[in-house]
């Protein structure tokens, strides 16, 4: 397992299709697909694109203005390296 400090997000951008672009402290860039998470009631406010777009790096994790957050290990270990992502990536409008 990598050092947790390397797994910390330092930048996040919401993308079309409820994806997140995340850059980590170790300079890895990854894509995290939030669609499965949106099925849970905890994340129901993020089904609204305007709410989803309001994601920020907050301390060691990602957090939305509506209060939801997600563990850094979850996004790190369940995301796809940017270079391996085979689909079109568009910033969310």
Description of each model-found segment:
Residues 1-93:
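Motif-centric detector for short Cys/His coordination patterns
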């Amino acid at each position: 397992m990598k050092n947790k400090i390397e797994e910390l997000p330092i930048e996040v951008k919401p993308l079309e299709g409820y994806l997140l672009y995340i850059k980590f402290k170790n300079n890895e860039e990854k894509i995290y697909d939030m669609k499965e998470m949106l099925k849970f009631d905890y994340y129901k406010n993020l089904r609204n694109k305007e709410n989803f777009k309001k994601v920020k790096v907050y301390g060691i994790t990602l957090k939305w203005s509506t209060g939801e957050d997600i563990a850094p290990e979850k996004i790190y270990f369940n995301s796809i390296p940017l270079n391996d992502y085979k689909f079109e990536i568009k910033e969310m409008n």
